[in-house]
């Protein structure tokens, strides 16, 4: 059997790579966040500059996500953050860039740096309402054009749609929630305090007055 040569730590994501990433964060003049994955805190005004430096070192943009920390119990710098996931294929090295944003604050688009930012930033805009300055076509990508608001914001109202199942069962959201709390049969037809593994009396779901709407 032919033995494969051992890969160096720099190409296997080992300790050397971790030290290299820490050194890179410091070299860029950024602060490292205390987290499981290497994460750098990037001031909004420096994002494109940092992205260009990383691209020139061989990093590519893998993903961009938004987070709404509204009602988060711990103290945080701002309500929103945009997290860019960049990766160096040759070194198998990953780095996250976290940018904190206040309500209504826009962020420079990374489309001029990585074309992959096109759809990624459109998704963040659609779901959180965060605008990206310099994006060539910033518009919705997932939700209908006539939907008002941004669904992944914490202040977005939760919608409810009655559901008619193929076998004729009908359930509406209030009944579903009541079933989960044991107040009535709910979605599954089980009633009472028997939802933790104990069998109770099986009760057929009750259709609303007038039948399915």
UniProtKB/Swiss-Prot annotation:
Record bears the keyword Lipoprotein: no
Domain of life of the organism encoding this protein: Bacteria
EC annotation from Swiss-Prot or TrEMBL: 7.1.1.-
Classification via SUPFAM superfamilies: Nqo5-like (SSF143243)
Keyword Oxidoreductase appears in the UniProt entry: no
Reaction(s) this enzyme catalyzes, per UniProt: a quinone + NADH + 5 H(+)(in) = a quinol + NAD(+) + 4 H(+)(out)
Summary of the function given for this chain in its UniProt record: NDH-1 shuttles electrons from NADH, via FMN and iron-sulfur (Fe-S) centers, to quinones in the respiratory chain. The immediate electron acceptor for the enzyme in this species is believed to be a menaquinone. Couples the redox reaction to proton translocation (for every two electrons transferred, four hydrogen ions are translocated across the cytoplasmic membrane), and thus conserves the redox energy in a proton gradient.
Protein name: NADH-quinone oxidoreductase subunit C
